[in-house]
A protein has these predicted regions:
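Active-site mouth loops of central-metabolism enzymes
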Residues: 19-29, 81-93, 122
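Hydrophobic faces of well-ordered beta-strands that scaffold small-molecule active sites
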Residues: 14-18, 46-48, 75-79, 114-116, ...
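Active-site groove signature of glycoside hydrolases
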Residues: 103-124
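Short, acidic/polar
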Residues: 26-38, 90-106, 152-155
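Beta/alpha (TIM)-barrel catalytic core signal, keyed to glycine-rich beta->alpha loops juxtaposed to Asp/Glu
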Residues: 123-305
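A structural motif
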Residues: 43, 108-111, 141, 165
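N-terminal binding-site loop/beta-alpha segment at the start of enzyme catalytic domains
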Residues: 1-75, 137, 218-220
Length: 305
């Protein structure tokens, strides 16, 4: 897999990230083997959140790390906090408590990156700044990012925190293409023209913030997978034809479509299937032409003015 710098930082990681939201039912030995398979495929970054499996995902990963002391230095781990039962919490106390819990479950003494999982409209920016200062000074967190933040939320946060925000996780896929559609359909009355994220794609490029695309195979908001879904015959026909020409799968083409964008995004995949993991990682070696990229985009039902 190709490696890339995250934001303007010294953190270098694979352009495909393994999301760990679904590992809670794996055994420690199964997860250990799976991590090895991911590393063999070229993946060096693993994505967690304190709510995944109600903490069990981090606990299992931590058991693997504890049984293999030299593994930690070979990989990058990021995790997220802010989502609680029925509300969001970016208070200083919750951020600090969350990180301590994350580190305890992962059985490590640092995170390569902490991301604020969802924007908390009640957050006191001075508190977030103090929490970041403590975490950075103590060595518990090396880099910081956000998730699902719009441009002005990042701008406001960055006005208070000293540490650069180097990543922003956003839902993005062929069928959930708001990030690009509002720009493509600018100055029209098309349904996709209204911008819902503060032009976050352009903002992140200007500020050298890496967008980490989550749910690359989903349509809607957790409505399901579009790959081989009979609801979407046209996009699957185009994906299938291009996949056959390139000698890879439809899923690999769907990821390659995201990686083709010059914003230099990372893609977070959440599979726990070894064969599918290796298959998707072939995306790193696929180069879509401009014509192919737009053909896939149009096949997904997105209009060009």
């Amino acid at each position: 897999l190709k490696q890339m710098n995250i934001g303007n930082s010294s953190l270098t990681a694979s352009e495909i990230v393994l999301g760990c939201m679904r590992i809670s039912e794996m055994s420690v030995s199964e997860l250990s083997r799976y991590i090895d398979e991911a590393i063999e495929a070229g993946i060096t970054m693993f994505d967690h959140a304190d709510i995944y499996g109600r903490g069990r995902c981090e606990e299992l990963f931590g058991e693997v790390l504890a049984s293999r002391p030299h593994l930690r230095e070979r990989i990058h781990i990021q995790s997220k906090c802010s989502i609680r039962d029925g509300y969001y919490d970016l208070s200083k106390e919750h951020i600090l408590t969350s990180v301590d819990g994350i580190l305890k479950r992962l059985q490590t003494d640092y995170l390569d990156m902490l991301l604020l999982h969802r924007p908390d409209t009640l957050m006191e920016l001075e508190e977030v700044a103090e929490a970041f200062d403590r975490l950075h000074a103590s060595g518990k967190v090396r880099h910081f990012g956000v998730s699902n933040f719009n441009s002005m939320q990042i701008e406001l946060l960055q006005a208070y925190v000293k540490q650069p925000i180097i990543a922003n996780q956003m839902q993005f896929s062929i069928m959930h293409a708001n990030l690009v559609t509002s720009g493509i359909q600018a100055n029209t009355l098309f349904d996709g023209a209204p911008n819902r994220d503060g032009h976050i794609l352009e903002y992140c490029r200007l500020k050298h913030i890496t967008i980490q695309a989550w749910s690359p195979f989903q349509y809607g908001f957790f409505e399901g997978v579009f790959i081989d879904n009979e609801k979407f015959p046209e996009v699957n026909e185009v994906l299938g034809r291009i996949a056959e020409e390139k000698g890879v799968s439809k899923s690999a083409i769907a990821v390659a479509w995201i990686l083709r964008h010059p914003a230099n995004m990372q893609v977070i995949i959440g599979t726990t299937n070894s064969a599918r993991l290796k298959d998707i990682c072939q995306a790193s070696h696929v180069q879509l032409s401009r014509q192919e990229w737009y053909e896939i985009y149009r096949a997904a039902g997105h209009r060009l003015p």
